[in-house]
């Protein structure tokens, strides 16, 4: 009797579907306009016979939205929670992803934008709107190596994080870093309005710091970037500098070597940028400052090592205390380029750290800046706006 009972159960056991050890991955798309409720795309493994897809279709309570019989094998449709669980247990299923709304990439214009934003989205001086693709740096990370950032500033929209401090308190007690972060990626004052902003504090609340501390901050960025999800790449900004330092230049180069784009301020001494660091490091993107009249800002450093110029005088941006401030310097020009790097990486993909600087140089408006000393490249940043 015992033997016959076991034998009687065998056909049932053999007829049961095989279960997998772990459920198939369930993906939720990021940075989309909207998700479609209870609607999923079921992707089967490439080696799966289509009969397995047919078996999955039988689980649906209604008609499928699409059946895929080509290179992409599977189906889509409304799937309730119980059926979703059954499908995820099917070893033939590769993954399941929630359906989402996808729209044409569109350019949008921010009316009455800060003058610096307006200037980098047009070839000619005059327009007051900032025109940009609404990808806006999505999927990128922007490291601000500075005085820290006020991460909870309302204009950062929850996209900002103060990570670490090598100078006392983790808070930005100066305002400089928060201003820089705002130009890179704040909602109102930023170039790349969807980038993630990451603060690394290497300067004190009085605005000073040691070379050794800055190097420690750079090493932190390299380490952090390896474990952080930034699918469209990472950029960094250093709106700081001092006399020539082989150590600081070497540390700045290590960011490039680790495929992190770096924009640095050319300096505010009205001298050759070859005399200061990290602006003199050849592999970084060194940024000089211009005025709203397209003249070299009187304070801006210059020379053949300046890759690009960007707005840097009377720049309105975020400030500590959840406020705003208008200040000047190549410190304000550099984040326009860090933001532009994040913007282009989100729009076109990340081509590599040095290649991204080359892309910015290639896009630049040439020959419009007045007052440049001989030998200084006459290149003003431009975001590639097709109507610009």
Curated annotation (Swiss-Prot):
First and last residue of the signal peptide: 1-15
Gene Ontology biological-process entries: proteolysis
Site positions (Important for catalytic activity): 268
Family annotation (SUPFAM superfamilies): Protease propeptides/inhibitors (SSF54897), Subtilisin-like (SSF52743)
One CC-aspect GO term: extracellular region
Disulfide cysteine pairs (residue numbers): 141-230, 285-357
Peptidase S8 domain location: 114-388
Regulation affecting activity: The elicitor proteolytic activity is completely inhibited by PMSF. The activity is also significantly reduced by aprotinin (leading to 37% residual activity), by leupeptin (leading to 54% residual activity), by the ovomucoid trypsin inhibitor (leading to 65% residual activity), and by p-aminobenzamidine (leading to 26% residual activity).
Keyword Ligase in annotation: no
Residue numbers covered by the propeptide annotation in the UniProt entry: 16-105
Compartmental location: Secreted
Role according to the record: Extracellular elicitor protein that induces a strong defense response in strawberry and confers both local and systemic plant resistance against the fungal pathogen Colletotricum acutatum, the casual agent of anthracnose disease. AsES activates a cascade of defense responses, including calcium influx, oxidative burst, hypersensitive cell-death response (HR), accumulation of autofluorescent compounds, cell-wall reinforcement with callose and lignin deposition, salicylic acid accumulation, and expression of defense-related genes, such as PR1, PG1, MYB30, RBOH-D, RBOH-F, CHI23, and FLS.
Cross-referenced PANTHER family: ALKALINE PROTEASE 1-RELATED (PTHR43806:SF58), PEPTIDASE S8 (PTHR43806)
Name of the featured protein: Subtilisin-like serine protease AsES
């Amino acid at each position: 009797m015992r033997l016959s009972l076991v034998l009687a159960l065998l056909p049932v056991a053999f007829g049961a579907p095989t279960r997998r050890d772990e459920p198939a991955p369930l993906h939720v798309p990021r940075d989309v306009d909207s998700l479609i409720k209870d609607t999923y795309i079921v992707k089967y493994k490439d080696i799966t016979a289509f009969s397995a897809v047919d078996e999955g279709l039988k689980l649906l309570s209604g008609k499928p939205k699409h059946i895929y019989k080509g290179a992409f094998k599977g189906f889509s449709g409304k799937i309730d929670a119980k059926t979703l669980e059954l499908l995820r247990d099917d070893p033939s299923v590769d993954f399941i992803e929630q359906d989402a709304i996808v729209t044409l990439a569109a350019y949008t214009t921010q009316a009455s934008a800060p003058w610096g934003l307006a200037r980098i989205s047009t070839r000619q001086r005059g327009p007051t709107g900032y025109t940009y693709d609404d990808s806006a740096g999505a999927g990128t990370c922007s490291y601000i190596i500075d005085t820290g950032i006020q991460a909870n500033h309302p204009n950062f929209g929850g996209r900002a994080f103060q990570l670490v401090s090598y100078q006392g308190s983790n808070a930005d007690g100066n305002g400089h870093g928060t201003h820089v972060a705002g130009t890179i990626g704040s909602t109102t004052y930023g170039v790349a309005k969807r980038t993630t902003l990451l603060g690394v504090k290497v300067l004190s609340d009085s605005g000073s710091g040691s070379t050794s501390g800055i190097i420690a901050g750079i090493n932190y960025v390299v380490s952090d970037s390896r474990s952080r999800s930034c699918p469209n790449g990472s950029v960094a900004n250093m709106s700081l500098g001092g006399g020539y330092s082989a150590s600081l230049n070497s540390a700045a180069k290590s960011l490039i070597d680790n495929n992190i784009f770096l924009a640095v301020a050319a300096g505010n001494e009205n001298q050759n940028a070859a005399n200061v660091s990290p602006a003199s490091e050849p592999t970084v993107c060194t940024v000089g400052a211009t005025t709203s009249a397209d003249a070299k800002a009187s304070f801006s450093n210059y020379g053949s090592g300046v890759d690009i110029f960007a707005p840097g005088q009377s720049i309105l941006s975020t400030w500590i205390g959840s406020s705003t401030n208008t200040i000047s310097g190549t410190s304000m020009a550099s984040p326009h380029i860090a933001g532009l790097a994040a913007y282009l990486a989100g729009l076109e993909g990340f081509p590599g750290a040095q290649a991204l600087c080359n892309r910015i140089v290639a896009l630049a408006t040439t020959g419009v800046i007045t007052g440049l000393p001989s030998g200084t490249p006459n290149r003003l940043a431009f975001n590639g706006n097709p109507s610009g």
